Amino acid sequence: MLAVDTGLVEEWLSEFKTLPEASISSYATNLKDKTALISSLYKVIQEPQSELLEPVCHQLFEFYRSGEEQLLRFTLQFLPELMWCYLAVSASRDLQSSGCIEALLLGVYNLEIVDKEGHSKVLSFTIPSLSKPSVYHEPSSIGSMALTEGALSQHGLSRVVYSGPHPQREMLTAQNRFEVLTFLLLCYNAALSYMPAISLQSLCQICSRICVCGYPRQQVRKYKGVNSRIPVSSEFMVQMLTGIYYAFYNGEWDLARKAMDDVLYRAQLELYPEPLLVANAIKASLPQGAMKSSKEGTKCIQVEITPTSSRISRNAVTSMSIRGHRWKRHGNADLGIEEELIEVSETDEGFYSRAASSTSQSALSNSSNTSSKNLLGKSQRRSGGSKAAGREKEGETCREHLSRKQTQRALSENLELVSLKRLTLTTSQSLPKPGSHSLARTTTTVFSKSFEQVSGVTVANNRGGVSGTEANRFSACSLQEEKLIYGTERTDLPVLSKQPNQQRPPSISITLSTD
């Protein structure tokens, strides 16, 4: 150490002792700008055999317990270098030369674990939840949240991590060493924004030294002085990474990158999951090129600007959302089969609708026309006489056989159509729509397929000149539209006129129970 540095340190020691109480505040404000003094103090700390080390440690402790914020931060900036000196001396087992440093570290620790009234501090950390807006993500949504009873009831549901109360320590041992050092590094990280560049450089350098000493990488880094391994804890390495991450974006890119690689190297050797997770996360978030931030500018960690729109989907998949999606799907299906629902009618006092589909209508028309022609021809031939009675009987038998086959074929086709419609109509498709006559009023849904009159005779008293083939197309829906509802003034559908040798028109009913 040079004589100039020794003179600056001695002047600093004597100045504070003669300083009046009223001048402490102005003295503390100007102290952080004395870069030459700060460099000289670093040189004193780095020489454990220096005679000035003990008075310097005592002076720094007086600064810390003075209660002045500027003096407290002045002492904190030397914490990384003090920790390295203590760990290096502990590794060499020369505990006598580290007594003053150990006393300073213990004094700062015992002052930090209690408040001004002497009670133990309990530090709390709220873990942000991604499902709720916080200052860490989507802070723009916080202002729009209404202060309701529901919001207040969920206020205390966030996960909170507590640190403390911490016991007081009278000496540092192998068991409590890193518990104390981790807490001190936590206090240092809390004041990172007030630390000068020389303190950030010291932090990165001592992190690299602690992690590689005694390992093959020490030869690559060309560190000398300490060749034995320095044990570290997982929590201590996480606190080191916190300071390194801040140094990345505040003018110390190269040193911070080297320190992070060394911490990651040591975490891989120790198989510590916490520092591995944090180091890999920092490494993945770093930009490709070096950050050229000004050392004199504002010190902050660059983060991505919070988006104006929420990144989290508010449409969470729940049982209610699944039910709603199912209802929407069934509602669309109901709209798509409106034509098929016309075929469905309500059972009302034994009434069955005479609706028929267009396909079955055409098939039945063909069969009825054929059968009517055969029957008319048969009656004409009977009145003709007995000249060709034998031939008429044979022709009659053939024609009756053909017409019977055609009628049976038409009936089988219509049965297949009705069966297909019954299978395709599901329970969800028969749900009632609001504002309409509900099918749920009855316990049975009847599908009625009435076939046209086989003889083809027109129906008497047709409404508005409707032909006999169209008279049976009225369904329950069409009757309700025409206000032909059964009630006190009940009107029956026109009854087909009966003729001799005419069978009752076949009617097929299929019942779908709601059970």
UniProtKB/Swiss-Prot annotation:
Query: Which stretches are tagged as biased composition: Basic and acidic residues?
Result: 389-403
Q: Kindly state which keywords UniProt assigns to this record, in alphabetical order.
A: Cell membrane, Cytoplasm, Membrane
Q: Name one Pfam family in it.
A: Hyccin
Question: Region annotation Disordered: residue ranges?
Answer: 358-410, 491-515
Q: Which GO terms describe its biological process?
A: myelination; phosphatidylinositol phosphate biosynthetic process; protein localization to plasma membrane
Alphabetized InterPro entries for the sequence:
Hyccin
Amino acid composition bias (Polar residues), ranges on this chain: 498-515
Q: Where is the composition biased (Low complexity)?
A: 358-378
Give the CC-aspect GO terms: cytosol; plasma membrane
Q: Does the keyword Membrane apply?
A: yes
Q: Where is the signal peptide?
A: none
This chain's function reads: Component of a complex required to localize phosphatidylinositol 4-kinase (PI4K) to the plasma membrane. The complex acts as a regulator of phosphatidylinositol 4-phosphate (PtdIns(4)P) synthesis.
* Entry protein name: Hyccin
**UniProt source species:** Gallus gallus
Question: What lineage is on file?
Answer: Eukaryota, Metazoa, Chordata, Craniata, Vertebrata
Gene it is expressed from: HYCC1
